[in-house]
Design a protein with these regions (language model features):
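Positively charged n-region of N-terminal signal peptides that target proteins for export
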Residues: 1-6
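Generic alpha-helical secondary structure signal
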Residues: 42, 58, 79-81, 139
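...with weaker cross-activation on analogous glycine-rich loops/strands in unrelated enzymes
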Residues: 67-132, 136
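Low-complexity, Gly/Ser/Thr/Pro-rich intrinsically disordered linker/tail segments
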Residues: 140-149
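N-terminal capping segments
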Residues: 7-70
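Short, intrinsically disordered low-complexity segments
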Residues: 25-27, 92, 145
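Terminal low-complexity, poorly structured segments
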Residues: 9, 75-78, 141
Length: 149
């Protein structure tokens, strides 16, 4: 067997494995209340720069076994693969909704937070959806995502 056939064979196997994993993860039972309760209970008094880690752990607590995450902005692409859909009305928040901000300025990894029913929470309890003046920029992209709609 030549090297090209081996590469093609492993690529097919890898794609099949990833596809099976995504189907499994999409079918997991999502409990947004448990996720929001977890992120709220574990929030720090102020930001420690680990928003993606804290929200990922909340997602796991909500029933989706997500063991590897990336930076905050990567969740804009990962969450739709897990069955989350973008919502357009920023005032139509529901418990468990997740907001993801693009990297901007010195915020190299973006920002991510979860709505707990009364406030946005990441690695700390936020006063509002905008946690830094960099995100007030009109060109700053963000997405609010919700599972199951």
């Amino acid at each position: 067997m030549n090297i090209l056939k081996v590469i093609i064979w492993f690529t097919i196997l890898w794609v099949a494995l990833v596809t099976c994993c995504l189907f499994y993860l999409r079918s997991c039972e999502w409990n947004p209340e448990k996720a929001a309760e977890y992120v709220t209970r574990n929030a720090e008094n102020k930001s420690v720069g680990l928003c993606a880690k804290y929200v990922r752990k909340a997602i796991v607590a909500g029933g989706i076994p997500l063991y590897q995450g990336g930076d905050a902005w990567s969740y804009k692409y990962l969450l739709p693969m897990l069955g989350f859909k973008r919502i357009e009305n920023v005032n139509d928040k529901k418990v468990g909704d997740i907001v993801v901000f693009q990297p901007i300025g010195k915020r190299y990894f973006g920002h991510i937070a979860m709505w707990n029913g009364s406030q946005w929470v990441s690695d700390f309890k936020q006063r509002n959806i905008i946690v830094h003046s960099d995100y007030r920029n009109d060109s700053c992209e963000f997405a609010i995502l919700r599972k199951g709609e």
